[in-house]
Every structure is written in structure tokens, then in C-alpha cells.
A protein has these predicted regions:
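Helix N-cap at the start of a conserved alpha-helix in ABC-type nucleotide-binding domains
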Residues: 161-163
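H-loop (His-switch) and adjacent beta-strand-loop-beta switch element
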Residues: 196-211
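Catalytic Walker B motif of ABC-type/P-loop ATPase nucleotide-binding domains
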Residues: 150-153
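Conserved ABC ATPase signature
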Residues: 125-129
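Conserved ABC ATPase "signature" region
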Residues: 103-121
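H-loop/switch region of ABC-family ATPase nucleotide-binding domains
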Residues: 185-186
Length: 223
């Protein structure tokens, strides 16, 4: 069953077409890697899927049963940011009038803290966390409301190799339990190692399929 279906999607900025007649779907349990050079529309596609950008034509069909989670590449959080990692994760609880968390919400926060390897640093101010720790906190926050589709927008770009693998190993653990993942990346090695399917965007065209069908010319274009 598809958690997202994109059909004949065209997105343009003025007279400049960024995405042209794109069609693909993400099914339950997919780990879709989206690859391509800068400027081919990867982030534009994400912004449109999140509802921030209206396409020129085509459709993005997201069933009511699909719940989106999103982890960006970067957030402007400096050393003075006051919240602990635990409190930051808890920010993604359902808005309501009560100023405190229910018992079930507290349990869910602790579950995400534990499952994202944050227990030992949960009281650390987020502003003092390392890049990898921050990304795990962003992941825990995104997963708190139990989404079934997680979008990672260049979420490993600023991390060293060890932290990249740690983050994606965590994501894969959730994916193997049914989470669908859409991972935008420039890292071809990560794409091939973690993806189950690929979407390759290039100027004016695209290709998609199982990760083992990633065309050889694209593999030779690694950076």
C-alpha cells in the first residue's frame, strides 16, 4: 500500500521548471533514497510534499492514514538554547490546553529517548550537544507522534562517517518495523547501503526502481 503517490508532478519557479512530470510512489516499509546533483529539485520536492510549495501541475496524494515525520539538515540552535534534549523531544506532543504531559505522553517521550540512544544525555542542554546528538534528538522528536512516513532532508550532511552510520542504523531499525523512509542525500555510498528503492533526479528527467537497479552511469557519478 502506498503511503504517498506522486503523479505527473511539475514544479516551477516563474519560467524555470525545476521538476518536470515526475511520478513515483512510496510504499509501506520502503527506504527510498532520493539522489541527484544540486539544483535538480530534491528539496523542492520535499517542500511540496510538506505543503509549503504549490506545484504547477500534477498531484501529490497522501492518504489520511499517512502520518508524516520530518528531520531537516540543519536547525538554528546555538549554545544558549535553554531546553534539555528530553524537553526538546517532548515539544512534539499533541497541542492542547494543559501545560503538562499526560502519563502516556511521558512514557512515549522516554521510549523515544531510549530507542534513539539518548538516555545518558537526556538532561543535557540541546545547545551543548554534538552534531550527531542533535540529529538523534531531531529524529526522536520527529518519531514521537508515531509517523508511518519519515522524510530525512540531507539529515546526515553535516555529520562525520561514524555519526552518519549511527543515525541511519537507528532509522533502519524503525524502517524494519514498518516505517517508510524518504532519504534525500548526496552520499551515493549511503544511498546504496541503506536504500531499498531509489529516485534519481536529473535536469529534465528522472529514474526510479529497486536499489539494485541503480543504473551504472549513475553509480559512476559518485562524489
Amino acid at each position: 500500500m502506498a503511503v504517498v503517490s506522486v503523479d505527473d508532478l511539475t514544479i516551477a519557479y516563474g519560467n524555470h521548471t525545476v521538476i518536470d512530470h515526475l511520478s513515483f510512489s512510496i510504499n509501506e516499509g520502503d527506504f527510498l533514497v532520493v539522489v541527484g546533483e544540486n539544483g535538480v529539485g530534491k528539496t523542492t520536492l520535499v517542500r511540496s510534499m510538506l505543503g509549503f510549495l504549490k506545484p504547477k501541475s500534477g498531484t501529490i496524494s497522501i492518504p489520511q492514514s499517512t502520518r508524516l515525520g520530518y528531520v531537516p539538515q540543519f536547525r538554528n540552535i546555538d549554545e544558549e538554547y535553554p531546553l534539555s534534549i528530553r524537553d526538546f523531544v517532548a515539544l512534539n506532543t499533541k497541542p492542547r490546553l494543559l501545560p503538562w504531559l499526560t502519563k502516556s505522553e511521558q512514557n512515549r517521550v522516554e521510549q523515544m529517548i531510549r530507542e534513539n540512544n539518548l538516555t545518558k544525555i537526556a538532561e543535557r542542554p540541546l545547545g551543548l550537544a554534538s552534531g550527531g546528538e542533535k540529529q538523534r534528538a531531531y529524529l526522536a522528536q520527529a518519531l514521537l507522534p508515531n509517523p508511518n512516513l519519515l522524510i530525512l532532508d540531507e539529515s546526515t550532511a553535516s555529520l562525520d562517517n561514524e555519526m552518519k552510520y549511527e543515525l541511519l542504523d537507528l532509522v533502519t531499525r524503525f524502517q524494519q518495523n514498518g516505517l517508510s523512509v524518504m532519504f534525500i542525500t548526496h552520499d551515493w555510498d549511503l544511498a546504496e547501503q541503506y536504500g531499498t528503492r531509489f529516485l534519481y533526479l536529473s535536469p529534465g528527467s528522472y529514474s526510479t526502481g529497486p536499489i539494485n537497479e541503480l543504473p551504472s552511469p549513475i553509480k559512476g557519478d559518485k562524489k
